[in-house]
Design a protein with these regions (language model features):
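Generic protein-terminus/edge-of-domain signal
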Residues: 1-80
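N-terminal regulatory/effector-sensing and dimerization cores
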Residues: 50-129
Length: 129
């Protein structure tokens, strides 16, 4: 069982989530340095997240669809609460509370808008060579 204090912190709206809920549109919160190209249709997230660390955790922003993208690292998406729908390599996948999915390097995917009570946790793993 998740600690109520932690759950309340995760459910609290961030300023970006407030904007996305109000505007019903995706707002980019990553700098251009996080991508290897300016192409919106084929954005690739780079190792931007891994400054002095090999694993990066974050709560996925709610209320707007996250555009199609891919990575130069592995990603696990874990549904802590509610539901998340992703389009992975052209196929729609529904994840429910407790589900997780491992996304390989270069896997194209997008995430449909999460609702008020949906919590998706992103766990990113840097590839060390």
């Amino acid at each position: 069982m998740l600690n109520n204090k932690l759950l309340n912190q995760l459910l609290a709206l961030t300023p970006l989530e407030e904007q996305q809920r109000r505007n019903q549109t995706f707002i980019e919160d990553l700098p251009q340095a996080a991508f290897d190209s300016k192409e919106k249709s084929s954005r690739t997230l780079t190792n931007y997240f891994f400054k002095n660390q090999d694993i990066y955790l974050s709560k996925h922003n709610r209320f707007a669809a996250y555009p199609n993208h891919k990575h130069t690292f592995f990603e696990i998406n874990y549904v802590l609460q509610g539901q998340a729908k992703e389009v992975i390599a052209g196929k729609t996948v529904t994840l429910n509370q407790g589900d997780l999915i491992l996304l390989d390097i270069g896997t194209s995917h997008s995430i449909q808008a999460l609702g008020e009570n949906d919590l998706l946790i992103n766990i990113l793993f840097q590839i060390i060579t």
